[in-house]
Amino acid sequence: MLLVINNALKSKLNGFMSAIGHGLAIGLYALFSVIGLELLTHNYYNIFIILKILSIIFLFYIGMISITKNKKENLLVKDNNVKNYRIAFLEGFTIAILNPKIFIFFTAIYSQFLSLDNNIVLNFTLVSTAMIVDMMWYIILTILVTVLGFKNFFYRRIFLIRKIVGLLFILISVVLMINLLK
């Protein structure tokens, strides 16, 4: 989030390009997660079930980390005058693609949706939804920061935002575990 905000503060187009790059990387991770989980469901179903359980635990863990993290993130902008759109795109793409936790996150989420009788439409929907939602979130964030001047709003509330997201992950993990035990 901070990278997109920093790029958005350089220029609106920088923010948009960073958002698109990030979204494409998220789409790739989503695609690889779906392909990997499909292979597991068809060839190693017991491992798939174990992975579902581990994924639920991971979501709970992410929620706990988000809730207990106290450090405020720094929103300082470096090189504010640099307006290289290609670099903004590459920064957005790189920060997402180099984060292996994203793959684990998608594996955790998608393992709850996939089964032996999946079809290509569901898989396409999972991948495209992740990519589009990610891009749109960061595009909206860019608009909020550049047009409406919400940088200080996010900065002052990053602690609260992190807590809310953490609680949401914990709630999702509890619901998924209840559904798995049924």
List the predicted regions and their residue ranges.
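Juxtamembrane transmembrane-helix termini in multi-pass membrane transport proteins
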Residues: 1-49, 108-129, 139, 143
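Functional transmembrane helices that embed catalytic/metal-coordinating motifs
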Residues: 1-6, 90-109, 132
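Small-residue-enriched transmembrane helix starts and helix-helix packing motifs
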Residues: 16-20, 80-98, 121-131
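Select subsegments of transmembrane alpha-helices in polytopic membrane proteins
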Residues: 21-28, 89-102, 162-166
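Alpha-helical transmembrane segments and their membrane-interface junctions
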Residues: 105-114, 175-180
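Short, flexible, glycine-rich and Lys/Arg-enriched loop motifs at helix boundaries
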Residues: 147-151
